[in-house]
């Protein structure tokens, strides 16, 4: 029997802590995933196509996450952040956060709508006939009208039936954005239409080509097209975004890029809300003149935009950007909002820059906030059913959608969402990605209760349960992952098609190119001979235990100081149990569920050489960014999704060598991978090298 230090059996807590944990099902028990679409991408290189299998794995895993154990009783526990090394918040802010009842705050958003309805009706009556006229662009139809109002119901019926009967195939085209980036546009077509060519996407890179409300043009200085000064990121996103296509955007800079795409989508959603509202008011006036007119201009409920973000700090930035772009000065409950969402505390400067960015400010991940727009004001904390925009964390909205108290469970307010945005998807993946899938399961469903809606004005594609084929979904992430691809490919069925960018990473810009350390790096590939993509985890485990484990036992490098880095928690538990039951290796283990005592004790024993191997999870590294000591060699059970983690972990060995405790010429870095790891490998070794690693004849490649 193996001897190991620490007994980290995983979490036994319930409530929010459990819901923050990541569970993945045993792939041997994998159930069939809804493979409604056959994906095709013309002119894509072999590496891009090889990542499709990885997308299927991620999609199957996320959809089968087991949520039966969620318990509501401990909801109000654990308000603290999952990374205690951050600087403490200011005392007044901490006291306030401890006092508020977050669950009650969310439930207030589901309260009776009657008071706001009366106020809203009064306001609409006083403002009818006060709509603005936009200047019509000469080179483009109004995409709001063409996508939502003028779309052929027969076409919607055909697409809907095609997805249902699995008769849809995406036809794609690829085009270059610049030397380091390309874009792929795909559109769903019936199998009977596959001989047709899809039109080239309209690329104008100009606000002037779209119907933007006059008040927004004035506020954002867009009246003169010569003053647009669009950044490269805004230029490539403007057209697919304002054409209501689905978007999967991988950006490169935490600070500037996030600010830029938020400015763009804030303008887009404001324009969408204003146009929706003004159309209803115009139709109200038309119906007063002729009540026999058919005016289909509404959904079941008012909310039209859902923005999903990881933390309150991100929510604060999003709301502030929307307020700035709107130009409205009257903001109801802004003081309360700042008290509950803003925090100027920062993580320690010793942490990496990316960590300080992700975990700055208020990192609380439990909230849902409604935003209601009137002619002269923005009302924060509005009732969800009377809101135009809902901003939430995955955990916060999960507690409404799948509340264990069935009387409090609701999803009707998501029935008429027309634009959904997931901001910082890469951070949300480290929380609990299954909550995003939960949202996608509940969005655009026909309401269970009859709301205050005029059914004579509800669009037919809402009544026919076809809203998901018109909904625009936009995902913004620092790194495109198999999960991100699975969401955009498997859960988004927008008739307008989908757009995503692809970074072309040179060897110089890769992790290895930026490492700055000469150390032996070995990449070992295992193949899925006769297996399917859902068997990949089993093949990896078998390869690791039969091949890589022998190197640990034989100690070809050092007798101790071996770090095994494991991205997936389920893989970590499987390997941990194997080493405990089937080997005699002395090992320590630390993961995201370890107590502080276990973390300190096991790290200390490993550093002192009392244990040979340290098992270390990626999620723990994401939340803590430990400076691990005593590392002489590293084994990556799977390539890290975040390429920064690859270099950070390797530098542990360099620091150990610098202290004279090891020889870097003897140290080795070993990475186990399959062809399904192409996305992660591109960022680590570069796009061209990754293609060779995935499809070359050799099974092992060395770098130094």
From Swiss-Prot:
Transmembrane helix found in the keyword field: no
Pfam families tied to this protein: Utp25_C, UTP25_NTPase-like
Alphabetically ordered keywords of this record: Nucleus, Ribonucleoprotein, Ribosome biogenesis, rRNA processing
GO molecular function, one term: rRNA binding
Domain of life the protein comes from: Eukaryota
GO cellular component, as recorded: nucleolus; small-subunit processome
Biased composition (Acidic residues): 42-58, 101-139
Keyword rRNA processing in record: yes
GO BP terms, alphabetized: maturation of SSU-rRNA from tricistronic rRNA transcript (SSU-rRNA, 5.8S rRNA, LSU-rRNA)
SUPFAM superfamilies for the chain: P-loop containing nucleoside triphosphate hydrolases
InterPro entries found in the cross-reference section: P-loop_NTPase, UTP25, UTP25_C, UTP25_NTPase-like
Main location, first listed in the record: nucleus
Residue span of region Disordered: 1-140
Subcellular location: Nucleus, Nucleolus
Biased composition (Basic and acidic residues): 10-21, 31-41
Job description of the protein: DEAD-box RNA helicase-like protein required for pre-18S rRNA processing, specifically at sites A0, A1, and A2.
Subunit field text: Component of the ribosomal small subunit (SSU) processome composed of at least 40 protein subunits and snoRNA U3.
Matches recorded under PANTHER family: ORF PROTEIN-RELATED (PTHR12933), U3 SMALL NUCLEOLAR RNA-ASSOCIATED PROTEIN 25 HOMOLOG (PTHR12933:SF0)
Sequence similarity: Belongs to the UTP25 family.
Name of the protein described by the UniProt record: U3 small nucleolar RNA-associated protein 25
Species, as recorded: Vanderwaltozyma polyspora (strain ATCC 22028 / DSM 70294 / BCRC 21397 / CBS 2163 / NBRC 10782 / NRRL Y-8283 / UCD 57-17) (Kluyveromyces polysporus)
Lineage of source species: Eukaryota, Fungi, Dikarya, Ascomycota, Saccharomycotina
Gene (name only): UTP25
């Amino acid at each position: 029997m193996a001897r190991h230090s620490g007994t980290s059996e995983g979490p036994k807590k319930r409530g929010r802590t459990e819901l923050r944990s990541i569970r993945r099902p045993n792939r041997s028990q994998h159930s069939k995933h809804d493979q409604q679409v056959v994906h095709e991408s013309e002119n894509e290189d072999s590496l891009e196509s090889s990542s499709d299998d990885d997308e299927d794995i991620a999609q199957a895993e996320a959809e089968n996450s087991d949520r039966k154990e969620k318990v509501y009783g401990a909801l109000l526990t654990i308000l603290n952040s999952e990374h205690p090394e951050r600087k403490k918040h200011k005392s007044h802010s901490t006291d306030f956060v401890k006092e508020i009842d977050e669950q009650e705050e969310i439930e207030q958003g589901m309260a009776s709508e009657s008071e706001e309805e009366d106020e809203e009706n009064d306001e609409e009556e006083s403002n009818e006939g006060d709509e603005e006229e936009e200047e019509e662009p000469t080179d483009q139809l109004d995409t709001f009208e063409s996508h939502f109002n003028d779309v052929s119901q027969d076409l919607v019926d055909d697409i809907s039936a095609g997805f249902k009967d699995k008769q849809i195939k995406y036809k794609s085209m690829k085009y270059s954005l610049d030397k380091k980036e390309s874009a792929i546009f795909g559109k769903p077509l019936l199998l009977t239409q596959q001989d047709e060519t899809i039109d080239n996407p309209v690329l104008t890179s100009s606000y002037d080509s779209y119907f933007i409300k006059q008040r927004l043009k004035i506020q954002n200085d867009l009246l003169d097209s010569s003053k647009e000064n669009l950044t490269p990121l805004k230029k490539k996103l403007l057209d697919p975004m304002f054409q209501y296509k689905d978007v999967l955007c991988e950006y490169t800079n935490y600070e500037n890029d996030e600010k830029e795409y938020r400015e763009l989508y804030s303008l887009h959603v404001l324009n969408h809300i204003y146009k929706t509202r003004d159309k209803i008011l115009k139709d109200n006036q038309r119906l007063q003149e002729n009540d026999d007119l058919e005016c289909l201009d509404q959904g079941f409920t008012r909310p039209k935009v859902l923005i999903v973000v990881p933390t309150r700090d991100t929510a604060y930035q999003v709301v502030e950007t929307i307020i700035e772009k709107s130009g409205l000065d009257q903001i109801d409950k802004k003081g309360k909002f700042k008290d509950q969402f803003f925090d100027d505390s920062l993580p320690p400067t010793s942490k990496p820059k990316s960590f300080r960015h992700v975990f700055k400010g208020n990192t609380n991940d439990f909230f849902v906030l409604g935003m209601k727009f009137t002619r002269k004001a923005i009302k924060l904390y509005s009732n969800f059913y009377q809101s135009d925009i809902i901003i939430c964390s995955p955990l916060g909205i999960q507690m409404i959608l799948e509340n264990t108290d069935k009387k409090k469970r609701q999803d009707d307010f998501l029935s008429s969402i027309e634009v959904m945005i997931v901001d910082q998807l890469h951070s949300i993946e480290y929380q609990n990605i299954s909550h995003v899938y939960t949202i996608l399961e509940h969005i655009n469903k026909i309401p269970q209760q009859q709301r205050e809606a005029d059914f004579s004005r509800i669009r037919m594609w809402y009544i026919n349960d076809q809203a998901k084929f018109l909904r625009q979904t936009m995902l913004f992430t620092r790194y495109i992952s198999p999960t991100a691809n699975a969401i955009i490919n498997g859960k988004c069925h927008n008739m307008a098609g989908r757009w995503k960018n692809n970074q072309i990473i040179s060897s110089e810009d890769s992790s290895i190119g930026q490492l700055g350390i000469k150390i032996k790096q070995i990449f070992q590939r295992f193949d899925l001979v006769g297996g399917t993509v859902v068997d990949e985890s089993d093949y990896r485990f078998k390869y690791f235990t039969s091949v890589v484990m022998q190197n640990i036992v034989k100690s070809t490098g050092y007798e101790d100081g071996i770090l095994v880095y494991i991205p997936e928690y389920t893989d970590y538990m499987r390997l941990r149990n194997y080493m405990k039951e089937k080997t005699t290796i002395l090992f320590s283990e630390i993961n995201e569920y370890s107590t502080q005592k276990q973390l300190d004790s096991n790290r200390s024993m490993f550093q002192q050489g009392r244990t040979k191997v340290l098992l270390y999870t990626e999620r723990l590294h994401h939340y803590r960014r430990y400076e691990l000591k005593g590392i002489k060699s590293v084994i990556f059970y799977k390539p890290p999704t975040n390429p920064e983690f690859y270099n950070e972990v390797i530098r542990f060995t360099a620091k150990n060598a610098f202290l004279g405790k090891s020889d870097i010429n003897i140290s080795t870095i070993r990475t186990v991978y399959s062809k399904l790891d192409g996305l992660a490998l591109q960022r680590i070794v570069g796009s061209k090298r990754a293609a060779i690693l995935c499809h070359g004849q050799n099974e092992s490649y060395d770098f130094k």
